[in-house]
């Protein structure tokens, strides 16, 4: 193997081990402007997009000890390395894809040491984020509490109203 390829292989291995997960993509009709915009979007969620030869990527997976079946064929592959939350990166890919006429196709991914198919990665991207889930839980907890507070308020105002009416009767 040439020195350049060995260096690239080591670099990809480091990215695989440093990342929390990755998403494999096929990119269709992807212009330089799309690529730049996509990379900028991903940087906001601590992720990066690389175009790699399949052979090099799957060799790096093998030497990193990550088991994953290669998607058939030769050529290039788009890889999103997620250094933060891999689900947020998948959501960014999905959002970008919606805005750019489905120019990206999910092939596979790895999130939390689990290998996923393209459909599974897309399904994960459609799930609510942790922030959204927390908001829903707080809403579920807060709703009954506000109802209890409303009931207590109406009971207390009812008692006060009774006392006021009794006081008015005795004054007459």
Curated annotation (Swiss-Prot):
InterPro entries reported in the protein's UniProt record: Ribosomal_uL10 (IPR001790), Ribosomal_uL10-like_sf (IPR043141), Ribosomal_uL10_bac (IPR022973), Ribosomal_uL10_bac_type (IPR047865), Ribosomal_uL10_CS_bac (IPR002363)
GO BP annotation list: translation
Assigned keywords, A-Z: Ribonucleoprotein, Ribosomal protein, RNA-binding, rRNA-binding
Keyword Ribonucleoprotein: yes
Keyword set includes GTP-binding: no
Cellular component aspect of the GO annotation: cytosolic large ribosomal subunit
Pfam families in alphabetical order: Ribosomal_L10
Disulfides per UniProt: none
UniProt GO molecular function: large ribosomal subunit rRNA binding; structural constituent of ribosome
Coiled coil region boundaries: none
Similarity section: Belongs to the universal ribosomal protein uL10 family.
Subunit: Part of the ribosomal stalk of the 50S ribosomal subunit. The N-terminus interacts with L11 and the large rRNA to form the base of the stalk. The C-terminus forms an elongated spine to which L12 dimers bind in a sequential fashion forming a multimeric L10(L12)X complex.
Function according to Swiss-Prot or TrEMBL: Forms part of the ribosomal stalk, playing a central role in the interaction of the ribosome with GTP-bound translation factors.
Protein's name in the database: Large ribosomal subunit protein uL10
């Amino acid at each position: 193997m040439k020195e350049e390829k060995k260096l690239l292989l080591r670099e990809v291995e480091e990215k695989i081990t440093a990342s929390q997960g990755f998403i494999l993509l096929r990119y269709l009709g992807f212009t330089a402007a799309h690529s730049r915009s996509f990379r900028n979007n991903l940087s906001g969620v601590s992720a990066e997009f690389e175009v790699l030869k399949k052979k090099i990527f799957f060799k790096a997976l093998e030497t990193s000890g990550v088991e994953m079946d290669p998607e058939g064929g030769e050529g290039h592959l788009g890889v999103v390395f997620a250094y933060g939350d891999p689900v947020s990166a998948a959501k960014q890919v999905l959002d970008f894809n919606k805005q750019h006429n489905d120019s990206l196709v999910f092939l596979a991914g790895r999130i939390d040491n689990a290998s996923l198919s393209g459909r599974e990665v897309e399904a994960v991207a459609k799930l609510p984020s942790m922030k959204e889930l927390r908001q829903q839980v707080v809403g579920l907890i807060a709703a009954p509490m506000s109802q209890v507070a409303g009931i207590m308020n109406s009971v207390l105002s009812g008692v006060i109203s009774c006392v006021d009416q009794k006081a008015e009767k005795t004054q007459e």
